[in-house]
């Protein structure tokens, strides 16, 4: 009953004006967004009218920043297709935010060569695909992952479960799950494995390693869309002595060697697709 859409027509201009006037002198502001995953984004004429009105409100108080929107594919508007209808989303805006559709960057650039694109939401598991395109193309200016830090709600959105044949993989999880678990950083402020992986992508560190927890017999790991495999940046697996564990080595180096207590386990290529080499190692 209190959803903001009930007050949007009356309050959106006033609230947006207040936000821009409050924050326009902060150097951290690089763009103003008029929304994220907006249902009416390509509707005619409603989407066009709303977009023009909000952009006009922003430019009334700040002409120095770009305007943008975060847009998902048309899973919620089945009568539309991205190739045919997405131009209406961005025609009043300076920069186009793409949610989870990095695979459209290059083809959309061919269709709209003046469009400036960034990833406004992306999956942790697809970090390499997104960042490779950022570095490859000047028209792709960056990538925002969903999310930087964990948050309360959407409980278990980023789960990784061990499931048997025919077992259901839910979108969300019940108690004791209470946060989304998709953050690169947890609620205590500690880095999670995907954050160390992203450090490698960003060239902040040359290499990082993580050990995958054992998968029970007759089970397989199912990682939800926003999830990350159940691995830890830890070498302490007391009680698993002699058991073989998977070790992921993340590096931009073309090849890596893994040693266990001074003994060479093997040498593998990492690959430019995901910069990962996986070794099977007996725990000592």
Regions found by a protein language model. Name each.
Residues 43-44, 79-80, 154-158:
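Short acidic, glycine/serine/threonine-rich loops at helix termini
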Residues 28-32, 49-74, 88-284:
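Substrate-binding clefts and catalytic carboxylate motifs of secreted carbohydrate-active enzymes
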Residues 1-27, 52, 60, 91:
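N-terminal catalytic cores of secreted or lumenal carbohydrate-active enzymes
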Residues 5-10, 40-43, 76, 123-128:
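Acidic-and-aromatic substrate-binding clefts and catalytic sites of carbohydrate-active enzymes
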Residues 3-6, 35-62, 83:
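Active-site cleft segment of glycoside hydrolase catalytic domains centered on the general acid/base Glu
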Residues 13, 76-81, 98:
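Short gly/ser/thr-rich secondary-structure transition/capping motifs
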Residues 16-45, 85, 89-95:
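Active-site groove signature of glycoside hydrolases
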């Amino acid at each position: 009953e209190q959803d903001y859409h009930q007050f949007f027509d009356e309050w959106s201009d006033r609230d947006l004006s207040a936000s821009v006037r409050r924050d326009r002198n902060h150097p951290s502001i690089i763009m103003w967004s008029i929304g994220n995953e907006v249902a009416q984004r390509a509707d005619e004429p409603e989407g066009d009218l709303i977009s023009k009105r909000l952009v006009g409100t922003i430019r009334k108080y700040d002409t120095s920043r770009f305007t943008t929107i975060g847009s998902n594919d048309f899973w919620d508007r089945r009568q539309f297709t991205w190739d045919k209808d997405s131009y209406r989303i961005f025609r009043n805006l300076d920069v186009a935010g793409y949610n989870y559709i990095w695979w459209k960057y290059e083809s959309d650039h061919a269709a709209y060569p003046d469009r400036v694109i960034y990833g406004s939401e992306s999956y942790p598991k697809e970090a390499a695909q997104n960042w490779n395109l950022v570095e490859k193309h000047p028209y792709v200016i960056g990538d925002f992952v969903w999310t930087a830090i964990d948050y309360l709600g959407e409980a278990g959105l980023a789960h990784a479960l061990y499931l048997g044949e025919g077992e259901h993989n839910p979108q969300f999880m019940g108690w004791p799950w209470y946060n989304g678990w998709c953050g690169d950083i947890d609620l205590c402020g500690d880095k999670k494995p995907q954050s160390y992986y992203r450090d490698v992508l960003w060239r902040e560190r040359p290499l990082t390693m993580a050990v995958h927890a054992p998968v029970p017999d007759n089970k397989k790991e199912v990682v939800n869309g926003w999830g990350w495999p159940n691995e830890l940046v830890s070498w302490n697996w007391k009680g698993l002595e002699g058991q073989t564990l998977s070790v992921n080595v993340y590096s931009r180096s073309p090849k890596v060697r893994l040693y266990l207590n001074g003994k060479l386990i093997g040498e593998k290529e990492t690959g430019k697709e995901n910069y990962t080499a996986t070794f099977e190692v007996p725990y000592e």
